[in-house]
Amino acid sequence: MMPVMTIRYYAPSLQMASVMQVVLPERDNLPLRSAHVLLGPEGSDSSWWLRHARLEVLASTSGVVFLMPAVLEGCGFDMAFGYRFGQSLCQDLFVELEHDLPSLALRPETTWVVGLGLSGLGALHAALTRPDRFCGAACLGAVPDIAAYRNGKASSSYLTPARLKCLWGQREDGAPSVPDTVDLLTKRAREGASLRFYLGGCADEPETKAFCAACSSGIPCHVQNLGLETPIQEPEIYLEDFLNFSVPPMD
């Protein structure tokens, strides 16, 4: 089987054609030990991770399969005014893999969703929304400052204020209505969901601290500060550290 594949498919949730990249371990005798759905930063296509990390090397040394859908403007969320990227991530991607690569046999207990920037928030939200699909999520970098986006004091080079309103809707004061991931986490903890989380930022940052506090009710959360200004500049370093956290050492 080729280590890198491009799968083009129709995504019913988006009602349009979509594409994902798949990176498999190159060693035929190496069992697949876990699957990692990788989301690039906001606005990125399915090739972003291929261009920014040595995924073939990491897949072959860790026994991991990497799955990379296009992020575009959705960041792993269903848009308030636009496409249902969240549903496509949690549903269409898995249906297509069952059809095209049934030998992967993805299992929820070994499937992670990983994101950068606002897609890191999308990854956390995806795992909390569908704990039947994922065993956990990683936000490679600090949890985005939701309050700053909510009051209009933060945006990104791709997600302008207008695009943010399309993504998350708009409150009466005109600011984007941002999903409250901490509330969703608290709900899942009460339900006894079996999830794990990795946050690649400083534990003292407000949103990271709030997320960890909510995790203290029973859901494991690991915070790793690698001292980098932004993980988007060195994504492979964060990804390698996350693999050390999420994938048990091979015998």
Task: Name each model feature, range by range.
Residues 1-251:
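Non-catalytic cap/lid and distal C-terminal segments of serine-dependent acyl enzymes
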